[in-house]
Amino acid sequence: MTEHCDLAVVRRVPSSFFEALRMDEPEHAIDVAKAKEQHDRYVQTLKGILPTVLEVAADEACPDCMFIEDTAVVIGATAVITQPGAPSRRPETRPVRDVLSGLGLTIVDMSAVNPDALTDGGDVLFTGRELFVGLSKRTNAAGLEVLKSTFEVLGVPVYGVSVIEGLHLKSVVTFADTDVLVVANNRSVAGDCPSQKLPPM
């Protein structure tokens, strides 16, 4: 099973971005103007390679809203609207739900399936065949179970992975190519994973 992407949904950087959640206090304050400029270039790049890019307006009441991947997990014609682990981020989901519903996708509201389920999309990695879900500070076992019950009936295996360090699974793992995951060389992710250490580039 492979997924061909021809559409992206993005969300603009709010001017309140300097109030975004963080694990540690940064050495320097966020340069919001620069962040907006960089995000604009990112959006223009997407528009150069994809037929359709949908933009959701920023919400000044939601400083983290530009991290739109945390609000939904989409595979094929099915979208799970997540319940983000940080309560302050939960209002971000409604506008994203509206956009995805308008595309005709089947919508599954995680909070309606299980009010205790929590998931940030940053903990969800889809390889085109299977779904890896990080169990982290922001994603719990109940959230994993909602994803399993939604996507495994569609033929997508779903696996939970404990995230020991870092905020999200995709902070320490990324999908590089068919059958290749790049994993941080530390104890961030629990479990035995067949791997090959590559020399520094």
Place the predicted regions along the sequence by residue.
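The feature marks the mature, well-folded catalytic cores of soluble enzymes
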Residues: 1-201
